[in-house]
Amino acid sequence: MKSGSTGDKDWQFDENIAAVFVEHARKHIPNYEGVIDKCVSYCDMNLHKQSRIIDVGCATGHTLEKLHSRGFTDLHGVDNSKHMIDLAPKHVATYHVSDRLPPAEYDMVLCNWTLHFIKDKKKYLRSICDNLKVGGTLVLSEKTSKDPEMIRMYHAGKKRMGVPDDEIKKKQAQLENVMFIQSVEWYQSTLESMGFTVSVIDADWCFTTFLCRKEQWIQGTYLTGW
């Protein structure tokens, strides 16, 4: 789903990034492991071990591996980078190399740090909604701000993680043409218009994580299916 490279061209998730993806993400995404752990904890507390879960933009399968270790057995991952999927642990999930959501009936959709690389977000969110059971849950993590002051604080966090200034500046330039940012308010209103109830469960400089429950409108009342 994601479009990274260490050269001067636009960011691509190539074999170089795939080989170090989790380490790279920990340095460049605020609270990367914390958000993943929240997803795993939520699944642990609210789903059966046989629930169907898909990780959209699964990269090398880090989240799926954690879910597998907790006993979940019907796990799926989709990513448009074959380099990522090639390095994912094949025994934990079924994987798809695609830029589309594989059609199925899901209990849980995880979509962390992926949609900001997709131009037509509404179309992809509609696909998620259509394939999510009533009462099902979407966890969505996105970059939601281009405010210069927020960017400055975000970059300061990268420096504290050991990322050098030149790497920060180069990656910012590489992402310019491949990352399409929308605001927190845009995500909330768009998701609510599709029948989700939305809560913010994590936020850091420029990034927001939403917990979205799919509900059904029947005779003037929202029913969750739970």
Residue ranges and their predicted role:
Residues K143-S193:
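C-terminal alpha-helical "lid/dimerization" subdomain adjacent to the S-adenosyl-L-methionine
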Residues M194-W226:
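Core SAM-dependent methyltransferase catalytic element
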Residues K123-V134:
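A short glycine-rich, Lys/Arg-flanked "PGG" loop and its adjoining helix->strand segment in the class I
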Residues L101-V109:
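A short acidic, Gly/Pro-enriched loop at the edge of an enzyme's catalytic core
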Residues M108-K121:
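A short SAM/SAH-binding and catalytic strip from SAM-dependent methyltransferases
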Residues I54-R100:
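Class I SAM-dependent methyltransferase SAM/SAH-binding core
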Residues G136-K143:
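Conserved beta-strand signature within the Rossmann-like core of class I S-adenosyl-L-methionine
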Residues M1-H48:
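Conserved class I S-adenosyl-L-methionine
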